[in-house]
Swiss-Prot record:
SMART domains: HOX. PANTHER family: HOMEOBOX EXPRESSED IN ES CELLS 1. It comes from Oryctolagus cuniculus. One of its GO terms (molecular function) is DNA-binding transcription repressor activity, RNA polymerase II-specific. Residues 1-44 are annotated as: Disordered. InterPro entries: HD, Hesx1, Homeobox_CS, Homeodomain-like_sf. This is Homeobox expressed in ES cells 1.
Length: 175
């Protein structure tokens, strides 16, 4: 290092530089606790958030509540459902149902579809004829059974998996 660079480094640090080649020094283990680490961890998402400003916390979109009640930030409590139920008396039944749907969406899950016996019978009959129904058949079934088309598609996927599993088990029993 040239004398000018060494002098500049001393001015930046504000203290004379001491060169130590010990493992502790190289790894930075000999630094005092109050010293700031020389390298920052690589967190590209932090740079994006910090450029948005100090109030750039990402929040779950929840419908507005009556009487100026605000929903708590998801990070405030590990279980948002429990926190939301504290405010249960303030909401009508439809608002509570909407809130529960929002919380299910937050967890990435939709409520499980409970098929009636009649719906299952119709779906099983169609499955016996065609285990890979096209979109037109699924939409027709959805209309007749009062279900969403994607629920019917998932039902057929699950039914094919069940059939495959039963074939595998029967092959295992024969061997």
């Amino acid at each position: 290092m040239s004398p000018n660079l060494q002098e500049g480094a001393r001015l930046v640090e504000g203290k004379p530089s001491s060169t130590s080649f010990s493992i502790e020094s190289i790894l930075g283990l000999d630094q005092k606790k109050d010293d700031a680490p020389s390298m920052k961890p690589h967190r590209p998402w932090a740079d994006t958030c910090s450029s948005l400003g100090k109030d750039a916390n990402l929040r779950l979109h929840v419908p507005s509540f009556p009487n100026g009640i605000s929903f708590p930030h998801p990070g405030d409590h590990p279980m948002p459902e429990e926190r939301a139920m504290k405010y249960e008396n303030y909401f009508s039944a439809s608002e509570r149902a909407s809130l529960k749907r929002e919380l299910n969406w937050y967890r990435g899950r939709r409520p499980r579809t409970a098929f009636t016996q009649n719906q299952v019978e119709v779906l099983e009959n169609v499955f016996r004829v065609n285990c890979y129904p096209g979109i037109d058949i699924r939409e027709d079934l959805a209309r007749k059974l009062n279900l969403e088309e994607d629920r019917i598609q998932i039902w057929f996927q699950n039914r094919r998996a069940k059939l495959k599993r039963s074939h595998r088990e029967s092959q295992f029993l024969m061997a």
